Amino acid sequence: MRGDRGRGRGGRFGSRGGLVQGYRPFVPHIPFDFYVCEMAFPRVKPASDETAFSECLLKRNQDLSPTPSEQASILSLVTKINNVIDNLIVAPGNFEVQIEEVRQVGSYKKGTMTAGHNVADLVVILKILPTLEAVAALGNKVVETLRTQDPSEVLSMLTNETGFEISSADATVKILITTVPPNLRKLDPELHLDIKVLQSALAAIRHARWFEENASQSTVKVLIRLLKDIRVRFPGFEPLTPWILDLLGHSAVMNHPSRQPLPLNVAYRRCLQMLAAGLFLPGSVGITDPCESGNFRVHTVMTLEQQDMVCFTAQTLVRVLSHGGYRKILGLEGDASYLTTEMSTWDGVIVTPSEKAYEKPPERKEEEDEALEEGVEAEDESMETQE
């Protein structure tokens, strides 16, 4: 070819300063998403009426939302604990566990709690190194102060690997312990809480702050609650973490050219369509974590097998949804988990579940590995004797 002339040695990029031989840069692909390129697919017939689907979505959200009594009890307990910790920050007195600040995080802070799971999360950032003794001392101090304020209320306190939790008769507040970032370099695994636990609590603060700034739109919150529900009812979606669901819900509602929130029925269908198209498969651009540096794609926390499972589960449910099976998917007609494993019929149309595409590579036996290593060593020795 004419363009090859004058290259000299070293191929197209030359021998100096070119690409490393054999190196292929990772270029993630973008899965098909109709709502990003809607202009390229003009409608040939009017959209079908989805009033009934929208009403079912709202009804399901209402069923999943915490009851007024649940909301009142969790609000009361969170407020009391928050006030006690705030007082310890302002006036610690003789109490030696120094606290930097306390922050509300998780579904309580985001407004995406579900009925029957009356648990709120607080993160307490310590100024000191987080020893197990300090965590227990803080837990005991908080619960003793609460009992002094209201002796009639029955409270329990349990320490755990992330901090401690305080429970009343019908509400629980988990206190996640972390420390100021400079202390993370001074940790001793035998004395202090696990660094992964501390980093996870700091990440929860970043997540709550991002959500408040970017995803506080009511449609996003309702969609996330519905996604949490579908994750519980279909085992194939179990690998999706709460943070992945938050980002997926936000993306489905807001990530399109007009930047105006999509209607709930459209966003719900879009979630399943994006998952079915391979949004969280290897090589996909996925969703980049807005709270981490280095273009971290959130779905890479899942194994390859889990990524495939999420995809084929969504593919089956998209087909069921397109043939009017939304009541089953939403859980309004009993258990529907069988849909992803058994054939189902919708108005004469048979939907066959998608099958897994990923197969685990065969595990090599230890004997084979040893034989391989011995073979390599023998080859090395023969090469040395030849030299």
Swiss-Prot record:
One of its GO terms (cellular component) is nucleus. The keyword Chaperone does not apply. The keyword Transcription regulation applies. Its main location: nucleus. It is found in: Nucleus. GO terms for molecular function: DNA binding; double-stranded RNA binding. This is Interleukin enhancer-binding factor 2 homolog.
